[in-house]
UniProtKB/Swiss-Prot annotation:
Enzyme Commission number(s) of this protein: 3.1.3.2
Any matching Pfam family: Metallophos
UniProt binding sites for substrate: H252, D253, H254
Organism: Arabidopsis thaliana (Mouse-ear cress)
Compartments it resides in: Secreted
Protein name in the entry: Purple acid phosphatase 8
Annotated Zn(2+) binding sites: D85, N123, H217, H252
InterPro entries per the UniProt record, alphabetical: Acid_PPase (IPR024927), Calcineurin-like_PHP_ApaH (IPR004843), Metallo-depent_PP-like (IPR029052), Metallophosphoesterase_PAP (IPR051558)
């Protein structure tokens, strides 16, 4: 029986988070909200990453969820990460929108997936009621759900920084077409972005963790449909490079992908295959940087210990597609 192990850490995390929010409110300096994620007794952590998924089980979402449950059990995962676009096509309209149950609670039902889910917002989520996804009511409906715009998960040997990337993208403001975006809490935009970039930079500088992982919905580097996000290349990437981030994990492109930068030690991982994928939609890329690309559904796992970080990509049938690992001394390996 692992029910106590599943439930108690979630309650502990929420309690610590509430305390952090209270303390932050008394502090005049801006600071990203923080969660504390307890590691395993040996200090290691294991988690799954999935993105671009919320389609009421269609486009193989249920099949991917099934395999996530199996792999999650095998790895005894501690938590999960969603890279955004949690609910298609236009987010949710309220905390009581049936999409939440139909696309999340009733899909990811495996015992191994009853762990904290750390979520970021994607552009499709911004087309709905953003405050609904951020509402604590969702945590009352399903205690796994954790979603803020930007925040940090502290897990001793690894710090994970979640960044709200949608407001960086110019075309959502300049050329929204028929889409209506919920920009409440984001405007004035320049002030929001400047504050966010400062907060992320400060949080990264203050991190004492062995590993630093940044999660955002949008790509920084990708050979997929959307390609590179120029705004993030110009504004966010220099901060990540200056602070020696190990991984940048994103969704947005509906594929699985690993790009190894030749300009820095950052590894760019795309996990956007949670449901609908874009078969054959891939652009040319420098073969020295492209480690792996898969134009189908799937997800990835991450394992961290004091000395090692391991990433594995799986397809919708649970087959291993790509493995990569690194040691903190800079030794890399495609397994």
């Amino acid at each position: 029986m692992d029910s106590l192990r599943d439930v108690k850490p979630i309650k502990l995390i929420f309690s610590i988070f509430c305390l952090v929010i209270i303390l932050s409110a008394c502090n005049s300096t801006a600071e990203l909200p923080r969660f504390v994620q307890p590691p395993e007794p040996d200090g290691s952590l294991s988690f799954l990453v999935v993105g671009d998924w919320g389609r009421r089980g269609s486009y193989n979402q249920s099949q991917v969820a099934l395999q996530m449950g199996k792999i999650g059990k095998d790895l005894n995962i501690d938590f999960l990460i969603s890279t955004g676009d949690n609910f298609y096509d236009d987010g949710i309209i309220s905390p009581y929108d049936s999409q939440f149950q139909d696309s999340f609670t009733n899909i990811y039902t495996a015992t191994s997936l009853q762990k904290p889910w750390y979520n970021v917002l994607g552009n499709h989520d911004y087309r709905g009621n953003v405050y609904a996804q951020l509402s604590p009511i969702l945590r009352d409906l399903d205690c796994r759900w954790i979603c803020l715009r930007s925040y940090v998960v502290n897990a001793e040997i690894v710090d994970i920084f979640f960044v709200d990337t949608t407001p960086f993208v110019d075309r959502y403001f300049d050329e929204p077409k028929d889409h209506v975006y919920d920009w409440r809490g984001v405007l004035p935009r320049n002030k929001y972005l400047n504050s966010l970039l400062t907060d992320v930079d400060v949080a990264l500088q203050e991190s004492m963790a062995k590993w630093k992982i940044v999660v955002g919905h949008h790509t920084i580097k990708s050979a997929g449909h959307h390609g590179n996000t120029i705004e993030l290349e110009k504004q966010l990437l220099p901060i990540l490079e200056a602070n020696e981030v190990d991984l940048y994990i994103n969704g947005h492109d509906h594929c699985l992908e690993h790009i190894s930068s030749i300009n820095s030690g950052i590894q760019f991982m795309t996990s956007g295959g949670g449901s609908k994928a874009w078969k054959g939609d891939v652009n040319d890329w420098n073969p020295q940087e492209m480690r792996f690309y898969y134009d189908g559904q799937g997800f990835m796992s991450v394992y961290t210990s004091e000395a090692e970080l391991r990433v594995v990509f799986y397809d919708g049938l649970g087959h291993v597609l790509h493995r990569w690992s690194t040691l903190k001394n800079g030794v890399y390996s495609d397994i």
